[in-house]
Amino acid sequence: MHLSITHAVTAQEKEELLTGLRAYNAQFLDLSTFSGDIGVYVRDDIGTMLGGLIGVRKGDWLNIDFLWVSDAVRGSGVGSQLIKTAEDEARRKGCKHALVDTASFQARPFYEKQGYQLQMSLQDYPYPGMQRHYLAKREFR
């Protein structure tokens, strides 16, 4: 047995590791419900992206991985539309709940306004004085 360290993980190494992990997890989970990205985007008339959301279905949950809204339209309701549209699509795909994490300098109040409730906060992440907040929305409608 040999132990190695790398700072340049290859696609092959990552896939080999994930194949083993998925095989183990398949004993406990229906992995067919752990697939399918959900992307929702807003663009202007010439195609420039003004905002977007990327999430993934994991069982009964929509995991929101990324949400961004351009300064040009921030505060106009675009973010709320992105969340609502993603939740509607996730529900159509079988999801019942949603999970998101956000940094203290990002969007916790926005998510709470959308009905998400704080589950926990990790202090001093990624740096001292900052937090990473985990929020969930149960039984979204």
Model-identified regions with their sequence ranges:
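Short hydrophobic/aromatic beta-strand element in the GNAT-like acyltransferase core
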Residues: 37-41, 52, 66, 132
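Conserved acetyl-CoA-binding loop-helix of GNAT-fold acetyltransferases
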Residues: 75-88, 113
